[in-house]
Amino acid sequence: SELTVEDVEPLNNADKNKVVIXI
């Protein structure tokens, strides 16, 4: 499944040690 910005940002905010998408 695809990750949208809305999906990714809360994940990054919850755990900044994990890279969801690399930017």
Curated annotation (Swiss-Prot):
Official protein name in the record: Testis ecdysiotropin peptide B
Species annotation: Lymantria dispar
Described function: Stimulates synthesis of ecdysteroid in the testes of larvae and pupae.
